[in-house]
Every structure is written in C-alpha cells, then in structure tokens.
Amino acid sequence: MAEITASLVKELRERTGAGMMDCKKALTEANGDIELAIENMRKSGAIKAAKKAGNVAADGVIKTKIDGNVAFILEVNCQTDFVAKDAGFQAFADKVLDAAVAGKITDVEVLKAQFEEERVALVAKIGENINIRRVASLEGDVLGSYQHGARIGVLVAAKGADEELVKQLAMHVAASRPEFVKPEDVSADVVEKEYQVQLDIAMQSGKPKEIAEKMVEGRMKKFTGEVSLTGQPFVMEPSKSVGQLLKEHNADVTGFIRFEVGEGIEKVETDFAAEVAAMSKQS
C-alpha cells in the first residue's frame, strides 16, 4: 500500500476542490495514484461541495469570438482549474458565447436567464458552482483577438491596421494591462486621485508646495503614459512605444477589452496545515 502523504492530499484537493477526507479516501482506494483517484471521484460524483451555490467561483475560462465587424468576449467561472478544463464545462461556455454572438447579447443577465436550467444541471453533474460572470462586445473596422491559455482574453479594434498588427497589439494588451487607449483618455477622477497621492508623497519629502507641484506634473505625465496603450513600450520592441508603432503603420486603435479569469473576485484561501491539525484532534 502506497503512503498517502499530506502533500498528495493537498494536491488532490487543489485539483478537485473536494474535502480533505474525501481526497484521502480516494487516494487510499487508488493506492496513491492521483490520476486514478480523480477518475474515480468523477465517476462517483465526489468532486462537489456541500453548498455549491454559495461557494466562490473564481476560476474558469475566457472565450472570444469575432463575427464580421463585431467581436465578443465572455467569462464563465467555476471553482477550480480542474473543472475549468472539463469538456462539459468548456462546451457550456462555448454554447453561451455562441448565443451571445448570435443574439448580439451584451447583457449578462439575459444570458444568465437563458441558460439557468443548463447551468443548474451542470452544477449538479460537475459538483461545483458555475457562474456566467460577464460579457462584452467591441465593434471596429479591423478586429483582433488573443487568448493567453484560457485565463486571459483580449479584443482590439483598429483602423488602418492589418490583422497581424492587431494580433500583436492584442498580445501587448494581454501582457501589459493598459487601462485606456491614449493618455488623454485617462479619466479625470483617476488623474485627480493619482495627483493627490503623488502630491502628498512630494510634500512629505519636505519640498515647498510650488516645487512639489512641478515635480508631480512630471510624474503625472509618466503615469498617464504607463496606464494607456499608446504610451506603453511595445512588448515586442520595447525601444518604441505603441503610439510610435501605430504612427509607423498609419493606424489607430479605437478600443480594446481585456478580461482575466477571476479578476476582482476574492478567493477563499484555506489554511491547509490548520485544517490537518484540526482533523487530527478529531480523530
């Protein structure tokens, strides 16, 4: 009989989201073979949580699709990366995306209502909470998309650009996370908030207010460049900015959307060592 170590139990928990005792039992029955344990747990329906609907769904997939001059991007969440790779979960996400594209739907509540029965059935089958989180669309003369695995998806709309350039720009957005297209697009409230932060920092250094304000002006120009697409160094050629690249191609970016799985969702972190200690006291 193979030794069932705590690290093996932890790995199975992370991959399946199942409880510690369920994982230990499955590993014991599979003689320490983690892949066989997962297969057996799937067959028995053991990969589940007691209250699925209340569990935090912070894993999942991003899906993108271009249809003519409109592109769509969708996020569907589950609880673990194990289920995110499940064929049934992937098929569900694809079906939701196809419906969004066919109906030009950008209201996530409409999609949720349309697929609620299928979602509930899939939750019962897979054993994890599933949530259609958000959907968005982008129109443009030239559209491009990029997916970094299944966790990051980007849409870019441009004028005067070819498909290869738009693809490269989408890859840049995935890597560099700009929030705006151009420095002048940075919203007034974002600028004001950052200005006050930088002014406080400058004043705390003991500089007179007039000098501090001049220092902050320079910092703000740098800040708006850092958070805007055209102001960032191009990831494939850092010696030039994205703005310079676009100028060379006589092209413009009219918009972009970047989704990353689980961004903004607070995941519940379990203290595995504490849980093991608690279970030991009970036995």
From Swiss-Prot:
What Pfam family is a match, any one?
EF_TS
CDD domains listed in its UniProt record: UBA_EF-Ts (cd14275)
The keyword Cell membrane belongs to this UniProt entry's keyword annotation: no
Chain intervals for the UniProt region annotation (Involved in Mg(2+) ion dislocation from EF-Tu): 80-83
Q: Which Gene3D superfamilies match?
A: 1.10.286.20, DNA helicase RuvA subunit, C-terminal domain (1.10.8.10), Elongation factor Ts, dimerisation domain (3.30.479.20)
Q: Where in the cell is it found?
A: Cytoplasm
Could you name the Gene Ontology cellular component terms for this entry?
A: cytoplasm
| Keywords assigned by UniProt, alphabetized | Cytoplasm, Elongation factor, Protein biosynthesis
Q: Which GO terms describe its molecular function?
A: translation elongation factor activity
Q: Which InterPro entries match?
A: EF-Ts_dimer_sf, Transl_elong_EFTs/EF1B, Transl_elong_EFTs/EF1B_dimer, Transl_elong_Ts_CS, UBA-like_sf
PROSITE patterns the UniProt entry points to: EF_TS_1, EF_TS_2
Q: Which SUPFAM superfamilies match?
A: Elongation factor Ts (EF-Ts), dimerisation domain, UBA-like
Give the NCBIfam families listed for this entry: tsf
Family of the protein in this entry: Belongs to the EF-Ts family.
Q: What is its biological role? A: Associates with the EF-Tu.GDP complex and induces the exchange of GDP to GTP. It remains bound to the aminoacyl-tRNA.EF-Tu.GTP complex up to the GTP hydrolysis stage on the ribosome.
What is the name of the protein in this document? Elongation factor Ts
